[in-house]
A protein has these predicted regions:
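A short, exposed loop/beta-hairpin motif centered on an aromatic-Gly-Thr core
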Residues: 14-25
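Short aromatic-glycine-(Arg/Gly/Cys) micro-motifs in beta-strand/loop hairpins
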Residues: 1-16
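Intrinsically disordered, low-complexity regions of eukaryotic proteins
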Residues: 4, 17-19, 42-43, 49
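Short, mixed-charge low-complexity intrinsically disordered segments
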Residues: 33-54
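A structural detector for beta-sheet-dominated domains
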Residues: 9, 21-23, 52
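Short, surface-exposed linear segments at secondary-structure transitions and domain or protein termini
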Residues: 25-34
Length: 54
């Protein structure tokens, strides 16, 4: 499994990032969708990147 970093912005302008462990980008998005269900605000944008160890 890889580590995926998702950077997101809410409708009030709050920006943050979370890291999830997933097999691929599609699974990472699915995990993120489950997490944002508990947010008080709507997420208006998000980007997903695979974390690479150097």
């Amino acid at each position: 499994m890889d580590i995926w970093k998702i950077i997101y912005t809410t409708e009030s302008g709050y920006e943050d990032e979370i890291k999830v462990s997933a097999i691929n980008k599609f699974m990472a998005w699915d995990i993120f969708e489950d997490i944002v269900k508990d947010f008080d605000e709507k997420v208006i944008s998000a980007d997903c990147f695979r974390v690479v160890d150097s």
